[in-house]
Amino acid sequence: MAEHGESSEDRISEIDYEFLAELSARFGMNLVQLAKSQEEEDHKERMKMKKGFNSQMRSEAKRLKTFESYDTFRSWTPQEMAAAGFYHTGVKLGVQCFCCSLILFGNSLRKLPIERHKKLRPECEFLQGKDVGNIGKYDIRVKSPEKMLRGGKARYHEEEARLESFEDWPFYAHGTSPRALSAAGFVFTGKRDTVQCFSCGGSLGNWEEGDDPWKEHAKWFPKCEFLQSKKSSEEIAQYIQDYEGFVHVTGEHFVKSWVRRELPMVSAYCNDSVFTNEELRMDMFKDWPQESPVGFEALVRAGFFYTGKKDIVRCFSCGGCLEKWAEGDDPMEDHIKFFPECVFLQTLKSSAEVIPTLQSQYALPEATETTRESNHDDAAAVHSTVVDLGRSEAQWFQEARSLSEQLRDTYTKTSFCHMNLPEVCSSLGTDHLLGCDVSIISKHVSQPVQGALTIPEVFSNLSSVMCVEGEAGSGKTTFLKRIAFLWASGCCPLLYRFQLVFYLSLSSITPDQGLANIICTQLLGAGGCISEVCLSSSIQQLQHQVLFLLDDYSGLASLPQALHTLITKNYLFRTCLLIAVHTNRVRDIRPYLGTSLEIQEFPFYNTVFVLRKFFSHDIICVEKLIIYFSENKDLQGVYKTPLFVAAVCNDWNQNASAQDDFQDVTLFHSYMQYLSLKYKATAESLQATVSSCGQLALTGLFSSCFEFNSDDLAEAGVDEDVKLTTFLMSKFTAQRLRPVYRFLGPLFQEFLAAVRLTELLSSDRQEDQDLGLYYLRQIDSPLKAINSFNIFLYYVSSHSSSKAAPTVVSHLLQLVDEKESLENMSENEDYMKLHPQTFLWFQFVRGLWLVSPESFSSFVSEHLLRLALIFAYESNTVAECSPFILQFLRGRTLALRVLNLEYFWDHPESLLLLRSLKVSINGNKMSSYVDYSFKTYFENLQPPAINEEYTSAFEHVSEWRRNFAQDEEIIKNYENIWPRALPDISEGYWNLSPKPCKIPKLEVQVNNMGPADQALLQVLMEVFSASQSIEFHLFNSSGFLESIRPALELSKASVTKCSMSRLELSRAEQELLLTLPALQSLEVSETNQLPDQLFHNLHKFLGLKELCVRLDGKPDVLSVLPEEFLNLHHMEKLSIRTSTESDLSKLVKFIQNFPNLHVFHLKCDFLSNCESLMTALASCKKLREIEFSGQCFEAMTFVNILPNFVSLKILSLKGQQFADKETSEKFAQALGSLRNLEELLVPTGDGIHQVAKLIVRQCLQLPCLRVLAFHDILDDESVIEIARAATSGSFQKLENLDISMNHKITEEGYRNFFQALDNLPNLQMLNICRNIPGRIQVQATTVKALGHCVSRLPSLTRLGMLSWLLDEEDMKVINDVKERHPQSKRLTIFWKWIVPFSPVVLE
């Protein structure tokens, strides 16, 4: 560490790319690409951050405190990071070493923080064990005093003499001034930053910036004569009162402690490990390989414990690992050889028996004399304490001292440290739970303020009567046992102040027992004994130096009198009590508490900590779990208590397959198994409790209730006083008039509700079945089934019975046709708050419905089918459920992946009931769907001049483009991380050989693909061969068809449709298409070239029924169609779009030979021979759809034949000009005869403008009308006519009303229209847009009228109002209406133009 100054930050790599490549292959993700990008971002952040030695973070406890807001979903615990020298910087997830400034942003499951630290910065002086001022998290300021100051007290009476002793004051302690220390009477001892008072001999260390030497002197050594000569008694008292923590504690309590110091707290690894104790290390070798040539006793003596993997052992202190032991190996020699800096080894050198503080690396200055530290020697310690005691008093002292030793011996035995988790977790290792820090908050009983505490802070504040509350299995017992162990082991100086620590389980005592009897029975065992008199004397004499750890508290009434008095009258004894109590039992002891500690949910990193230790031999299993939970964030909270983790450990240990099945329901099953084992003697009581709690959970779930009161519990039959209930529910009473009850988590509530629903549906009692059906039928829409109740239904399926399953399957498969429910989508807000990830899922599903109702239907159908089949197979009722399944499949379109379901292996004939199966193949050729140029529309426009308050109505295209580019980049990065997988054909139907039934129709969607690779080709060959009919839809995928030639040639007789957009067909691909004999539909659009070879030979497709060609700006399409095309008499759809002039005569001939024509679209620029075209069309009696655009239209000619099309459903004349009134009137009259018309896009022109009101009236005769569009023709009178017609009830089926670009309508006309429009129950889209030159600035009354209008349109989901200049107040009105609208979650308002200019702001 060069000069302890700025550290140069070289580029470092935290990533193990070899392992990452393995992980990528395992999970099908390109993690390497993601890691490189993340590493670059991290490097940039490192360069910005401050480097150099950080003296403020040399305290491990302070480092630990920085992790309070740290993300819990990590692989490293804060304790591991703080012990390795790291603190949380607050910059993302970055942690930094206080010494070498190493900055890490990532975690690693395979490498601990200390290992990563050593690898990246082996030169770090903290890691090398040099004195850099590290303060262990359990370390204390009070130090063992030197026996003699050289020259005696007199030498240091003068402040300047004391100041001279600080010549070598360490660099890391410069935050505390030597002058301030010397002024307060202290002399530097030369050891670390330890100082000693020349007068009282009190010794202090661990000085940090901001420390006040006088305050420390007064707190720890208030009787010092020098202190009392310089400070008044009031000042000293104030110093003590203001001191944080250590109430009633002085330095004497630490100096005269009876606790043996096992190790100095300077290790950078596991400095509170239980393995400091040899017996506990020995216990870990019970599975040591018998064939190993090295005895485990020697390994234990050398500081090692067994990891459980191969013959790998790890040092509890330095963390070093050794393996591959051979005959003749000496563990101690190898330990010294490979890990010479190990603190444990250095300690062994210092002393063979009593383990003192490590000798300083630095030479001692003249201020002190070096003498052997013997203050912890038994005789000296006893003498210093007993010197003035009488004989009877000396007896209690000796017995108390003996008792302390017996207690320490008890607490360091394996039998004490093992968790008492009967049967279900008997294999859980000693260090697995004791090594975890629980998350704790402190609540002062008289203050509502809560604060998070680290474990060192808890230990510093132990005083008087305190409780630690938590749910069942939250770790209360572990926490108390950990305190007892740390005290006994000598690993925790913070606890040295206690001479006696009693851990007592209150569940195994009787009210008539004496305290001494309880202690003897529980803690001392055979041969151990202490009298009530001696115990009483010890407590009275030691007072604050006695700590009671009372576990399993259930109430004051059940306590023996002695313990009752210690709690209720603690002011008489002044002992310290920490009582572990379930959350719902706190109330009766709250009056006696000073502080209440509450254990929070078990952080996920603690789960990883336990599993990593428990399954160190199978770390891949733990990696899978972490990835599973990273993908399912809602489930991370299920490991909310150590007991849940212990349950899953047992499940994994007993059931290897469970390691690959990370279902939360499995965890809950394991937890319930634990309860059944724990309470197997009272199985009926447990079942009754689970049933009643399940009823409460079920009622709450369907009423969105996750908090309950006593009345709710009573109604469901839940007994809140039964202990079993506490394992399922928690009680909260703080700051509440009435207690509130919650289940252990929202998911656990759903689990219990699922258990109860299955119980009801499987019951023999009709009342129970009816109640179960009542709840099931409340899931009355597909969205509820796949969203709000998705998790619940999966839980139900895990319990499904043969009696319940067919009922559930039948109900689920009927939901897909509940159209009314689909149109009333709304999420359960309370549920979404508890399951935020479910909200994202809901948004996706809702967005899918908005964009593509067809895709939504297929998606929902597949999801419901999968769920139904889970029920059927889990309950072995496939035969009973098959009638419902087969009925569901009939005529449906699903994704190809459903064929992997087991059902299609068992029942391949069901495939024939489907309409079709879809498969999507997506590449990474990015294609923008939007043309940014805007030249066509905007090139002749001048930027509008508007007032500043209306500028928000326009967004510059550059800003929009920037956002769009960012979205594209996100998509690209996502695609790089998740490579496109091949269609999965590995299970179910695909394992049948031969395949008895074929896919009726296969729809293949290909997007943004280049040529297919060999793997995809092989998949397509198999899928095509299993299909009767194949339809292609290709977008931006040039070269794809040629690459799958082998597959097409094998199945060319099956291809019936080919739709191609934005791709170029090579000559070879055109020839390939011409070999498809069964082609019935051909669509070509938006290509840059004319596929002339294909078009010249269209007549070879003898079965062709549909031709759609949309090629704007390309050569005349009609001219390249062969004359023989007219022989295709089966043509049903002909759609031609070209912007060039065309020869009409050929088209006329074609139409004359297409008697079955249903759809005719034409866009081109010619006016000749229009009459012959109309005559030909008039002969097509089956026409359902007509669309004209471009200059290919003579109005009168078309109007004359219009009445012939009595079957017409869609008529689009948008943009066609009707100039004269006579023709327009005839057109209006003809409309009345088109009784089946569903969509009408009215032409424009002066003539139409004059008869607009007549057209509206004629529309009243069109009962099927769904879409109605008027552009450029409406005025105030005609637009109000639409409103009146609607209000009269004439447009009941209307879904889309488009009256945009009607600039003859004034503001008053709009206002009248809004005020009158009503009675459109199905209207979903209303368009009132104007162009930019026709922008309109309206008054508040008009906006208000629009708001009222919108509120009267209950189905409205889209409102277009571009060029309506709205200020902030106007938008507030609109948004308020939107919030209150029945479709508020779906209603979208378009009011902002995207333009290539900025508006001119008027002064």
Swiss-Prot record:
Annotated residues for binding of ATP: G473, S474, G475, K476, T477, T478
Stated role: Sensor component of the NLRC4 inflammasome that specifically recognizes and binds flagellin from pathogenic bacteria. Association of pathogenic bacteria proteins drives in turn drive assembly and activation of the NLRC4 inflammasome, promoting caspase-1 activation, cytokine production and macrophage pyroptosis. The NLRC4 inflammasome is activated as part of the innate immune response to a range of intracellular bacteria. The NLRC4 inflammasome senses Gram-negative bacteria such as L.pneumophila and P.aeruginosa, enteric pathogens S.typhimurium (Salmonella) and S.flexneri.
GO BP, one annotated term: innate immune response
SUPFAM superfamilies: Inhibitor of apoptosis (IAP) repeat (SSF57924), P-loop containing nucleoside triphosphate hydrolases (SSF52540), RNI-like (SSF52047)
UniProt subunit comment: Component of the NLRC4 inflammasome, at least composed of NLRC4, caspase-1 (CASP1) and some NAIP protein. (Microbial infection) Interacts with S.typhimurium (Salmonella) flagellin.
Keyword flag ATP-binding: yes
Family annotation (PANTHER family): BACULOVIRAL IAP REPEAT-CONTAINING PROTEIN 1
Keyword Protease: no
Keywords: Apoptosis, ATP-binding, Immunity, Inflammatory response, Innate immunity, Metal-binding, Nucleotide-binding, Repeat, Zinc
One GO CC term on file: IPAF inflammasome complex
The name this protein goes by in its record: Baculoviral IAP repeat-containing protein 1f
